[in-house]
Curated annotation (Swiss-Prot):
Region span, Triple-helical region: 42-1527
Domain of life: Eukaryota
Entry text on domains: Alpha chains of type IV collagen have a non-collagenous domain (NC1) at their C-terminus, frequent interruptions of the G-X-Y repeats in the long central triple-helical domain (which may cause flexibility in the triple helix), and a short N-terminal triple-helical 7S domain.
Bias type Low complexity, positions: 47-62, 224-234, 408-417, 429-439, 495-509, 568-584, 839-858, 929-938, 968-980, 1040-1056, 1237-1250, 1413-1425, 1433-1454
Similarity comment: Belongs to the type IV collagen family.
Region annotation (Disordered) ranges: 47-943, 955-1304, 1316-1339, 1367-1525
Keyword Repeat listed: yes
Name used for this protein in its record: Collagen alpha-2(IV) chain
Signal peptide: 1-26
Annotated source species: Caenorhabditis elegans
Pfam families referenced in this protein's UniProt entry, alphabetically: C4 (PF01413), Collagen (PF01391)
Protein task: Collagen type IV is specific for basement membranes. Together with fbl-1 and downstream of metalloprotease mig-17, recruits nidogen nid-1 to the gonad basement membrane thereby probably inducing basement membrane remodeling required for the directional migration of distal tip cells. Required to restrict presynaptic growth at the neuromuscular junctions in late larval stage and in adult motor neurons. Vital for embryonic development.
Length: 1758
């Protein structure tokens, strides 16, 4: 609340200050507008206060039912549906980005042995393949296991931490190990008088009493298992069991009751040493370490071992049947198979032969030996609690119990007194290497070292399997491999069955393969193909017993087993964790008196001053007092001896899940899976009978088959023969019976014989305590246990006699102060122990001034003082000696290219070369500049008019000529009569959707009707008959809108109607040119139409992409679509068309030359020097430090005297190439070189983009005079940019050139001539030579005082101040509660130096050395880029100054462009006759002159002199009014992204501010920051994969050292397979331009595939696709505001941006980049559930919304 109260006034002041500023700004924005209208841009005012509440309106009529409500919350997840059918095979996808390497797969199951193939030919041994290219470094591995704890590092500097808030109470830790015995505590305070003691020690043990009757079961838990007892004697044989007849030899009697448990067996002999046990459990996971920075990529590792085969992939689509393969080598014989699943029931057998004679003795067999003990059963469920037993007799006194669990930690004590300075510590172990520093500058290449000694080859641990390397080069053809695993059966649709192969020879015995792991029972398989019918298949013989299988998965918990035989005595286990604390025992007997205690502390003096009386007699012992309050917990006592194990506690609650245990041994075989569905019978031929397999294990017993017919009774055996006969031979196999229905699974078989007990293993390590097991069966009675807990106290006995006096007791508690007289002073006591430090007391009153003391010891070093004032600059020092030559500098970067040399002397003219071969006709060149006028030829004599020639042969139709000059518009012709309607054409192919028409006019609003009741929906009508073609009726009045009816079924197509009249020309629609459709079938050629009248000029369309050159038609009304006609005969060249609209303005010119360099600013003031730090203790020499940052520049010293020349330094390394130098002076023109040989003809170039408009051609022949009817005035053109000034006019007709005269002497200065026509503005000249520095100007007028600033906000709390002077000691206060932890103490004194540590490993290469002495001054750099234009100066009118002196002549400028010919000047004086010129080109033939009167035939005269030029013509008609000038710029900024490598042009009439590269967003510290593509910040002038760095609170900044990323709009360059680096990146980065727009811009989105219109009063800039959002790595990203032009990209890409990794300097399209676009939404699907849809390449744009970027029109603004 205090903070809020304090912020209130500050906020009010800030608001008042802002209001004042806004008022001043609003006053300053409008200027004096009295004389001329001015455009005032006021800021928008703040929102007014709400008005008063109006009166309530009248109640409206009931409204129509509302629209459908919002969708309800998402329902619960439905049950999983059945798997859908397999889809059709999709199109082939695009090439994916390379995936990350997969994990190593597990071992696959061994495949089934293939059939033996025919032996192949022995192949040659292939040569070893070349090693593969080393793989790229793999991604960083998983974090390793925590390493061993490092050695202690050096003591760190004290941090400037502040006391943090107390943290939350932590969870209780695990009980600690018992501590070492602590020192004896101080004597406690004497206790109060105790209760009366219990009875004394028990007497000697009496004779044993008779056994009592068994008590009720006790409540206690089952005690620990006792040691095994001695081996009992063998009991007598039991009585014979009852006789019971079974059919064969021995008779098994019923199972007897379990006998009593035998005595404890003797310990067995020590077993052999067991196999080493499994590794122990992993240790507790360490505390999570600080997150390390991502390391740089390591060097490429060596090629790893081949990885294990991966997991089997999902089954592919079923392939076609392949060709028959070659026969394989005979396979190795397979292993003995595992036991099969139980077979189905066989068919019912025939009657067997008569059995052997029965009989046998009917005596019971002798009881068999006892079986081996069964495996211990799983622990049974806990039994119910027994009834409580009667209390037993009191046991003997128990031994002293062990120490209890350590108590909870006590409250924190007061801080102890400051200890003395400790001795120097033992030197610490060498610290852990610190983190690697920033890589230093590269040092010079070192000399090669000496060859090292050969290393010792201690074998290391085998490394982990590496990632698979890149594939090696293919080796030569290897030998034929073993037959592969049998593939899935192919389709038998296409292939023909192959011929049966020959049977191969049996192969040799193979090696035993590893047993595969049994899988879990599979799900029922799908129904198989129909199998072949087997007509005479005999069942196979029973195989031998197989090897034992692997253990299956652990089965479910079995029923509780019988108790097993006692096992051998195990070794004593490690001590378990301490059990929970037991219940408190009954009080023990009183102990013996202790020894007398130490004398107590001196008591407090009493207030009374009475004399002590004589000592009294000792009093009688009092009765036991009431028990006192429990005392404070004492300190933990010393660790006592280990007590007897306590009783097991109650089972605790379920603990948290433990760490994962080690993998258990493989379980036993699982149960067989359920049988699959019955397959259909197959079609194959029966195969050859197989060889008999190895003997398998007996399968599980199947269900009994149907009983056979009863056999014939056997003959009775003779009386004396009782032995059973051997079994007979098996009968012939019976005929197969009908297939029985699948039986239920058989019962589990009998429990097998228990195996032999294994050898006892070695003692394992103690495991973590497991969860408490279920209670086992009661064990064998153990030996006598320890004494029980003492019983409840007995009844108090009669009072005994007075005993002998005991030893003197402990001191009693301090008595209450007596009332006696004070005694004599006692003798001085022994010095007491040092007491605890008291709390600081309150300050005392100041004492009197003491005498002057001795001088004190020197004080600690004080803190640094404030920096002193700057001293006066020192006098110049003497000239120093020459320094030593510096260390050779590093290799410099390449220098800039030098300036051009002076031009060489022109060489001699070479001899003419041989004439070249005629070249191929070149492409049509651009029109050349007009040539120099030739000398006028003599006029020829006029010819006679010739005879009219015959008509020539009609020529081939020529190519379409270039457009002629625009003619005058013709008269409008009369409107033609409508033609006869033609026959209806055949219906054409359906065309593409047309452009959207303009919206129709709104109809008259109907009268609102009364609200009717809702009617029922009508039924759809039946399909109607097709009506006749309707004729046009008169247009009726618009009816009222009706309710929409139900949609009827589609009727049949009607007859084609009469074609309508030709509609008026529609307005041109907006839109981009569509994709060209497929070429239709050729149509019937149409008749040639009459030439139509010229149309009126249309409005300017948006600039489209350059389309194919089409014929321009007039937009007609859509007729019935016809087929394409056959190409017509080329028509004659048409008349010149009407003049078009003025064209778009041309592209802005090239940037001008750099401007004059600005005036050099004053040098800024130097900053104050920083506070010097404390001087630390001298440390040991540290490792080589990193280069420091450059220090602040010092104050300038006075100039020193010139020093002696130093010795020359070592030559520097070659520098980097410099920037290009300025152009040299123009050289003397060289002589004409020899002609070269003609080159080979080049390939035909691609058609270029449409070029800019060429220069005007030469004037054509004069046309026939046209009719001069004035055409309509065209619409005003777009505003043009201000033109450049024209060039100065050329002088008049050129006289003949005279001989070059000698230069004359300079004449006198003539009078100023008349001003000439203004010349065109010349190009900027090259930079002039920099002038000398001018004299300093006069100081300016001091400025006015500034306005007072806004009061600042309250500053943040400052840091802790320096410690103050120590105060006076205070009065001791009361004992406070434990305080917060204090600040860290001051740094302690340095210890003595330690002994030298173990030599460390070789350190990394040190950083670069200190920089050498400064090198010589470099050459001046090239001019920097042109700075941004400065701000506009004030608008005040300033009187022009006087004309300045002429400047120095500038360097010669670049050659200007050829100017337009100027106006004719007056004729010059005749020069002397020139040398005869070369013959000029023939002139164009003159027009035929008029026939003159016939003159006298005179001699031909010489040609006369040129006449005077004619007078000026009459002035022309006034021109059309000019367009409005450029609009007032409001500073709106627009950004345009080209999504190509071309820099985009700004829209017409807009000025480009800069261009650059399109930045989408950046990511750092796992967070991203988005750029709005419509804002100027998204167009960076320079590109880098890492355009930013990051800084932390330690004043350290890091660049390109972590996994930071940048994302840029990309081009349509094809996606690369691997990341691109350096110059390869440039083709993928989009370019952009920032333009200044005349008004605000917005983006409009249609959410359809139609281009939206701009709002009224806005005009279009470009159209595009609606880009909404993007995400990249870590699901970070951003989005575009839909109103920003950045949300409307001109081109759609599924991947419109690329990710660049800053530290690696590479860019790539990764698979986790997603772009999000607004989609199309139909009107009828606005509130429906969207249907899932996947669009393949080629159809992507069909669901992406279109958009248009619009700018506010500024036509009305002045």
């Amino acid at each position: 609340m205090k903070q809020r109260a304090a912020l209130g006034p500050v906020l009010r002041l800030a608001i008042l200050a802002l209001l004042a500023v806004s008022y001043v700004q609003s006053q300053a924005t409008c200027r004096d507008c009295s004389n001329r209208g001015c455009f005032c841009v006021g800021e928008k005012g703040s929102m007014g206060a709400p008005g008063p509440q109006g009166p309530p309106g009248t109640q409206g009529i009931r409204g129509f039912p509302g629209p459908e409500g919002l969708a309800g919350p998402k329902g619960l997840k439905g049950a999983q549906g059945p798997p859908g059918p397999v889809g059709i095979k999709g199109d082939r996808g695009a090439v994916g980005v390379p995936g990350f390497p997969g994990n190593d797969g597990g071992n696959g199951r061994p495949g089934e042995p293939g059939p033996p193939g025919a032996p192949g030919w022995d192949g040659c041994n292939g040569t070893d393949g070349a090693p593969g290219i080393p793989g790229r470094p793999g991604p960083p591995g998983m974090p390793g296991f925590p390493g061993p704890p490092g050695m202690d590092g050096l003591k760190g500097e004290p941090a400037i931490g502040y006391a943090g808030a107390p943290g939350e109470k932590g969870d209780g830790g695990m009980p600690g190990m018992p501590g070492l015995p602590g020192p004896s505590g101080r004597d406690g305070y004497p206790g109060e008088k105790g209760d009366r003691g219990d009875t004394g020690n028990a007497g000697p043990r009496g004779p044993p009493g008779e056994a009592g009757s068994p008590g009720n079961p006790g409540i206690g838990s089952i005690g620990p298992k006792g040691d095994p007892g001695d081996l009992g004697s063998v009991g007598p044989p039991g009585p014979p069991g009852p006789r019971e007849f079974t059919g064969s030899g021995s008779i098994v009697g019923p199972r007897g009751n379990p006998g009593e448990k035998g005595d404890k067996g003797e310990p067995g002999e020590g077993g052999q040493r067991g196999y080493p046990g499994n590794g122990g459990l992993s240790g507790q996971p360490g505390l999570p370490g600080m997150k390390g920075e991502k390391g740089l990529s390591g060097p490429a590792g060596p090629r790893g071992k081949e990885g294990r085969p991966g997991n089997a992939g999902p089954p592919g689509f079923k392939g076609d049947r392949g060709l028959d393969g070659l026969g394989g080598i005979p396979g190795l014989p397979g292993q003995k198979g595992e036991a099969g699943y139980p077979g189905r029931d066989g068919p019912k057998g025939n009657s067997g032969p008569p059995g052997p004679p029965g009989g046998g003795t009917f005596n019971d067999g002798a009881p068999g030996p006892p079986g081996l003990p069964g495996r211990p059963g799983n622990p049974g469920p806990p039994g119910t609690d027994g009834y409580p037993g009667a209390p037993g007799p009191a046991g003997p006194i128990g031994n002293t119990g062990g120490p209890g669990l350590p108590g909870y930690p006590g409250n924190e004590g007061l801080p102890g007194p400051k200890g003395d300075k400790g001795d120097g510590g033992i030197p610490g172990a060498p610290g852990v290497s610190g983190p690697s520093g920033i890589p230093g500058l590269p040092g010079p290449k070192g000399e090669p070292g000496y060859r090292g000694t050969p290393g010792q080859s201690i074998p290391g641990l085998p490394g982990k399997d590496g990632k698979p390397g890149l594939d090696g080069a293919p080796g030569r053809k290897g030998e034929n491999g073993l037959p592969g695993v049998r593939g899935p059966p192919g389709d038998s649709l296409n292939g023909l069955p192959g011929a049966p192969g020959q049977r191969g020879a049996p192969g040799p015995n193979g090696y035993d393969g590893r047993d595969g792991v049994n899988g879990l029972p599979g799900a029922p398989g799908t129904k198989g193909d129909r199998g072949g019918t087997c007509s005479a298949c005999a069942p196979g013989t029973k195989g031998e017993k197989g090897l034992p299988g692997y253990s299956g998965q652990p089965g479910p918990q079995g029923d509780r087993g019988l108790p097993g035989m006692p096992g051998p005595v195990g070794d004593a286990g490690d001590d378990g964790l301490p059990g929970p604390a037991g219940r408190p025992g009954s009080p023990g007997p009183p102990g013996q008196d202790g020894f007398p205690g130490l004398p107590g502390q001196k008591g407090e003096p009493t207030q009374l001053t009475l004399r002590p009386g004589p000592p009294g007699y000792p009093g009688l012992k009092g009765e036991n007092g009431f028990p006192g309050q429990p005392g404070v917990d004492g300190l933990p006592g010393p660790s006592g001896p280990v007590g007897p194990p306590g009783a097991p506690g109650y089972p605790g609650e379920k603990g948290d899940a433990g760490l994962p245990g080690l993998s258990g041994k493989p379980g036993q075989d699982g149960l067989p899976g359920l049988p699959g569905n019955k397959g259909e019978a197959g079609y194959g031929q029966p195969g050859q009978p197989g060889f008999p397999g190895a003997k398998g294990d007996g399968g599980l017993p199947g269900l009994p088959g149907t009983p056979g017919l009863q056999g014939m009774p056997g003959e009775p055996a003779p009386e004396n023969q009782v032995n059973p006969a051997p079994p007979g031979q098996p009968g012939l196999p019976g005929l197969p019976g009908t297939k029985g229905e699948g039986g239920y699974p058989g019962r589990p078989g009998e429990v097998g014989q228990p195996g032999f007990p294994g050898l006892p293993g070695m003692k394992g390590d103690s495991g973590l305590p497991g969860p408490p097991g279920l209670p086992g069966h009661p064990g064998v009675p153990g030996d006598k246990g320890f004494g029980g807990v003492p019983g409840l106290p007995g009844i108090p006995g009669p009072k005994g006699d007075v005993g002998n006096p005991g030893l003197p007791g402990l001191n009693g508690q301090k008595g209450e102060p007596g009332v006696g007289v004070p005694g004599q002073p006692g003798s001085p006591g022994f010095p007491g122990l040092k007491g605890d430090a008291g709390l600081p007391g309150l300050p005392g009153t100041p004492g009197l001034e003491g005498q002057r003391g001795f001088p004190g010891a020197p004080g600690l070093k004080g803190g640094d003082g404030l920096p002193g004032l700057s001293g006066q600059p020192g006098y110049p020092g003497e000239k120093g000696d020459a320094g030593l030559p510096g260390v050779p500098g590093r290799e410099g970067s390449p220098g800039f290219p030098g300036q051009d040399g002076l031009p060489g002397v022109p060489g001699m003219k070479g001899e003419d070369g041989l004439p070249g071969l005629p070249g191929v006709t070149g492409l049509k060149g651009d029109l050349g500049a007009p040539g120099q006028s030739g000398a006028p030829g003599l006029p020829g004599a006029p010819g006679y008019p010739g005879m009219k020639g015959n008509a020539g042969i009609p020529g081939v139709p020529g190519f379409k000529g270039d457009g002629g000059l625009p003619g005058l518009p013709g008269l409008n012709g009369p409107k033609g009569e409508p033609g006869v309607p033609g026959m209806p054409g055949t219906p054409g192919m359906k065309g593409n959707g047309g452009l959207p028409g303009l919206p129709g006019r709104d109809g008259l609003s109907g009268v609102p009707g009364m609200k009717g009741d809702r009617g029922f929906n009508g039924l759809p009508g039946e399909k109607g008959e097709a009506g006749p073609a309707a004729r046009d009726g008169q247009k009726g009045d618009a009816g009222l809108p009706g309710q929409p009816g139900l949609r009827g079924p589609q009727g049949p197509s009607g007859l084609p109607g009469v074609p309508g009249f030709k509609g008026e020309t529609g307005l041109p629609g907006y839109g981009q040119p569509g994709q060209p459709g497929e070429k239709g079938l050729p149509g019937i050629p149409g008749k040639a139409g009459r030439q139509g009248a010229p149309g009126s000029p249309g409005q300017d369309g948006l600039p489209g992409f350059p389309g194919m050159k089409g014929e321009s038609g007039y937009p007609g009304q859509d007729g019935l679509p016809g087929r394409d006609g056959l190409p017509g005969v080329p028509g004659q060249k048409g008349d010149l068309g009407q003049s078009g609209q003025p064209g778009l303005s041309g592209a802005p010119g090239l940037d001008g030359q750099p401007g004059v360099p600005g005036i050099r600013g004053d040098k800024g003031q130097g900053g104050l020097p920083g506070i010097p730090g404390d001087r630390g203790m001298d440390g040991y020499p540290g490792q080589k430090g990193e280069n420091g940052y450059p220090g602040q520049p010092g104050l300038p010293g006075l100039g020193g005297e010139k020093g002696f020349a130093g010795t020359p330094g070592f030559p520097g390394l070659k520098g980097s190439p410099g920037y290009p130098g300025q152009d040299g002076l123009p050289g003397i023109p060289g002589l004409k070189g020899d002609s070269g040989f003609p080159g080979q003809p080049g390939q035909e170039g691609l058609p270029g983009l449409s070029g800019e408009k060429g220069m005007g051609g030469l004037p054509g022949m004069p046309g026939q005079p046209g009719q001069s009817i004035a055409g309509p005035v065209g619409p005003p053109g777009a505003p043009g940019l201000q033109g450049k000034d024209g060039f100065p006019g050329l002088p008049g007709q050129k006289g003949e050139s005279g001989l070059s005269g000698l230069p004359g002497a300079p004449g006198l200065k003539g009078e100023s001539g008349m001003p000439g026509f203004p010349g065109a503005k010349g190009d900027l000249g090259a930079n002039g030579i920099p002038g000398k520095r001018g004299e300093d100007g006069l100081p300016g007028v001091p400025g006015r005082d500034g306005q007072p600033g806004i009061p600042g906000l309250k500053g943040e709390v400052g840091g802790a101040g320096l410690p103050g002077q120590p105060g006076f000691p205070g009065i001791p206060g009361l004992k406070g509660e434990g305080g917060l932890p204090g600040f860290p103490g001051a740094k302690g004194e340095a210890g003595f130096p330690g002994t030298p540590g173990v030599p460390g490993y070789a350190g990394e290469k040190g950083d670069g050395g200190l920089p050498g002495l400064p090198g010589r001054d470099g050459l001046p750099g090239a001019d920097g880029p042109v700075g941004p234009p400065g701000p506009s100066g004030p608008q005040n009118l300033v009187e022009p100054g006087e004309k300045g002196l002429p400047g120095l002549p500038g360097a010669p400028g670049l050659r200007g462009e050829k100017g337009m010919p100027g106006l004719d000047g007056p004729p010059g004086n005749d020069g002397p006759p020139g040398l005869p010129g070369q013959r000029g080109n023939d002139g164009y033939p003159g027009a035929p002159g008029l026939s003159g009167e016939k003159g006298m035939g005179g001699l031909p005269g010489f040609p006369g002199l040129d006449g005077q030029p004619g007078g000026p013509g009459a002035p022309g008609l006034p021109g059309a009014p000019g367009a409005a000038g450029p609009a007032y710029r409001d500073g709106f900024v627009l950004v345009k992204h080209s999504q190509t490598t071309e820099v985009p042009r700004c829209p017409e009439g807009q000025t480009k501010l800069w261009d650059g590269y399109s930045l989408l967003y950046i990511e750092g510290n796992e967070k991203s920051h988005n750029q709005d593509l419509g804002h100027a910040g998204s167009c960076l002038q320079r590109f880098s994969t890492m355009p930013f760095l990051f800084c932390d609170f330690n004043n350290v900044c890091n660049y390109a050292s972590r996994n930071e990323k940048s994302y840029w709009l990309s081009t349509s360059e094809a996606i690369p397979m691997m990341p691109v680096n350096e110059r390869e990146i440039e083709p993928y980065i989009s370019r952009c331009a920032v333009c200044e727009a005349p008004a605000n811009t917005i983006a409009v989105h249609s959410q359809t595939i139609q281009i939206p219109n701009c709002p009224a009063g806005w005009s279009s800039l470009w159209i595009g696709y609606s880009f909404a959002m993007h995400t990249g790595a870590g699901a970070e990203g951003g989005g575009q505001s839909p109103s920003s032009p950045g949300s409307c990209l001109e081109d759609f890409r599924a991947t419109p941006f690329i990710e660049c990794n800053g530290a690696r300097g590479s860019c790539h399209y990764f698979a986790n980049k997603f772009s999000f676009w607004l989609t199309t939404i139909d009107n009828d699907s606005e509130f429906k559930v969207p249907e899932s849809q996947t669009l393949k390449s080629g159809n992507l744009r069909t669901r992406v919304s279109r958009c248009q970027v619009c700018v506010k029109s500024t036509d009305g603004r002045h």
